[in-house]
Amino acid sequence: MTTDLNGLSVFIPDDAEAELPLICALGEDVSGINAIAGFMDCKAAIVALPVDDWNAELTPWPAPPLRRGKPFAGNADKMLERLDRLMSELPTLLKSKMGITVSKCLLIGYSLGGLCALWAATMRDCFDGVASVSGSLWYDGFDEYIGGHAVNAHAVYLSLGDAEPRTRDKRLGRVGDSTLAVYDRLTKMDIRTVFEWNPGNHFADAPKRSARGADWLCKNV
């Protein structure tokens, strides 16, 4: 079921246990977290963090647009503020309202949400695990950024669709190499990291892919 806790939409399993992982799902609304939960094997509380403008709210710094799209505004610092408030309030609310103790805190995101999740883990140390699912790690300047910043997590899940690097857009096409570079960087930092290839393009099976990442974190953190 999905319940409202102080304005936050949170999925709680019907047979919730006394201790559950808390998954913060960047860019997902109620239907998104319900879809992810439906594909998961592990039980977890999942909180929705919907956004109105992915190109603005999930990007860490400005960048030019893709083709004829909107420029990337680089306003992810506002998402950090939301995450700060959430992490200061939600574990206490889950305990007082639902009788649930948070066992671990996980951050997941798809596409630009995956980019934002990894960036947030360089800015905060409150997440035990991070999943960048079909993450937009091609993003201008991210290779250089991640090379010079520590990722504050015990485990990181990375994935891409196998068709994602095969695109005519040169910026998007570097996503495979960029994700491999992030994987190498994280393993050298002794962070438990996995990089999975899924069949299909960037848009295929998004909730199922996110669920795979969430399950892996639940089992490996």
Regions found by a protein language model. Name each.
Residues 126-138:
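A conserved short beta-strand
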Residues 24-27, 134, 160:
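The conserved beta1-alpha1 loop
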Residues 108-113, 117:
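Gly/Ala-rich beta-loop-alpha elbow adjacent to hydrolase catalytic centers
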Residues 118-122:
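Short, hydrophobic alpha-helix immediately C-terminal to the catalytic nucleophile
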Residues 100-103:
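Short helix-loop-beta connector
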Residues 9-11, 16-97:
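Serine-hydrolase catalytic machinery in alpha/beta-hydrolase-like enzymes
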